[in-house]
Design a protein with these regions (language model features):
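A surface-exposed beta-strand-loop module
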Residues: 83-140, 190
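Glycine/proline-rich low-complexity spacer/linker segments in large multi-domain proteins
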Residues: 27-41, 116-117, 125-169, 213-221
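Short, hydrophobic/aromatic-enriched beta-strand segments in well-ordered soluble domains
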Residues: 64-70, 118-133, 165-173, 195-201, ...
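Hydrophobic helix-coil surface modules that form long, contiguous segments used
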Residues: 158-314
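Short active-site segment of divalent metal-dependent hydrolases/proteases
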Residues: 317-318
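Bacterial Sec-dependent N-terminal signal peptides
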Residues: 1-29
Length: 320
C-alpha cells in the first residue's frame, strides 16, 4: 500500500512539473491547444491594418506591413504566427518603439519590454510568403484555408480570434483588386495604384482574402443588392452564362434570407471566377472564389453539370 501511495505521489509531482511552463519557454511549432486557449483568453479587440506592395513581375517579392492592435488582460509575451523564413521579418515596433526580433518555431515572440496592460500596437515590416499567394503572370489570389494565413503575414492564426481587417494594396496601375470589404479610395501615382479598402466585419484569418490582377468585370443589381463578377474567360459562349450565374447567386441569397429570417450579414457579395482554382469554391465573405470549369460550362452541358453549378453556388452562399 505504501509502495502504491509513493508511486501515486511521484506521478502527481511529475505531472505538476510537466505542466509548469517556465517564463521564456520556446513555443511549439504550429498552434498548440494551450497556446490557442491562452491567446483567446488574454487577447481581445483585435484589428489588423495590412498593406501589401505587389509587383507586376511575379518573381519579385511582395513587401508587407501589418499593424496589429489588441487589448491584453495582463503583461506577458505576445506570440504571433509566421510560418516563413525568419529573415523575412524586417522590423518590429511595439507601441511605437523599435524592438528586437525574436523568432522561434514559426512564431514571432514579442517580449514585454514595451507591452502594457490594455491597448497595444505591434507593427511589423515583412516580406510576404508566396505559398498562399497563388501568383500567376497577370493575377494572384490568396487562399488561406485552413491555417495558412500565417504563411502570408504575421497573425494569430486560429479561427476563434476574429478580427477587423483594414487592407491597402499597392498594385500596377492597369490592375484591379477585390477583397472582403468595399473599396474606400484609389490613388494613382507613377504607374502604380494604391487601393484602400473599408474595414471588414470581424473575420477569422482563414476567411481574409484579396485578389489582384487583370480581370474583366460585370455587375448586376437586384433588390437593393449589387453583385460584381470578376473573370478572365474570353470565350463569348461562356461569358454569356453570367446571366444564369447572377440568377443563381441572387436566388440563393433570397432563399436563405427567407428561410432563416436573417438578412445577408456582410456588406457585399462579389464573386471571382478563377482559372484553375484548387476547389469548387471558397466562401470568403465579400469575395467568393469559384473554379472556372465549374462555373463556365461548355456549349452542351449535362444536367449534372448544371445542377452541380447551382449546388456549388448555393453551398458557398450558405457558408456565410
Amino acid at each position: 500500500m505504501k509502495k502504491q501511495l509513493f508511486f501515486i505521489i511521484l506521478l502527481g509531482v511529475v505531472e505538476l512539473l510537466a505542466g509548469c511552463r517556465p517564463e521564456g519557454k520556446e513555443p511549439e511549432t504550429g498552434v498548440s491547444i494551450g497556446l490557442a486557449r491562452q491567446r483567446k483568453q488574454d487577447i481581445s479587440n483585435l484589428q489588423y491594418r495590412l498593406k501589401f506592395r505587389i509587383p507586376e513581375n511575379k518573381q519579385e517579392e511582395v513587401i508587407g506591413k501589418v499593424q496589429i492592435t489588441l487589448k491584453q488582460e495582463k503583461v506577458q509575451p505576445v506570440v504571433l504566427d509566421f510560418r516563413e523564413d525568419p529573415h523575412k521579418v524586417k522590423q518590429l515596433k511595439v507601441n511605437g518603439r523599435p524592438d528586437s526580433i525574436r523568432i522561434s518555431n514559426e512564431h514571432i515572440v514579442v517580449g514585454t519590454d514595451y507591452l502594457k496592460k490594455g491597448a497595444n500596437e505591434i507593427e511589423i515590416d515583412f516580406i510576404a510568403g508566396n505559398q498562399s499567394l497563388n501568383r500567376n503572370d497577370e493575377f494572384l489570389y490568396t487562399l488561406l484555408v485552413p491555417e495558412r494565413a500565417r504563411t502570408l503575414f504575421p497573425c494569430f492564426d486560429q479561427p476563434d480570434m476574429k478580427a477587423v481587417f483594414t487592407l491597402q494594396l499597392d498594385i500596377p496601375e492597369q490592375w484591379v483588386a477585390v477583397a472582403n470589404a468595399a473599396v474606400e479610395s484609389e490613388t494613382l501615382h507613377e504607374g502604380r495604384k494604391l487601393i484602400a479598402f473599408q474595414p471588414t466585419q470581424p473575420l477569422s484569418t482563414y476567411l481574409f482574402s484579396f485578389v489582384a490582377g487583370k480581370w474583366q468585370q460585370l455587375a448586376e443589381s437586384r433588390d437593393g443588392k449589387t453583385i460584381v463578377m470578376y473573370y478572365r474567360e474570353t470565350d463569348p459562349q461562356k461569358v454569356a452564362q453570367h446571366t444564369i450565374i447572377f440568377d443563381q447567386v441572387f436566388a440563393s441569397l433570397k432563399w436563405l434570407e427567407d428561410y432563416t429570417g436573417i438578412p445577408y450579414p456582410f456588406d457585399k457579395y462579389d464573386l471571382v471566377i478563377v482559372p484553375g482554382f484548387q476547389f469548387g469554391g471558397m466562401e470568403h465573405p465579400g469575395a467568393v472564389l469559384y473554379n472556372d470549369k465549374r462555373m463556365f460550362l461548355g456549349p452542351h452541358p449535362t444536367i449534372e453539370e448544371e445542377l452541380g453549378r447551382m449546388e456549388l453556388i448555393a453551398h458557398e452562399t450558405t457558408h456565410m
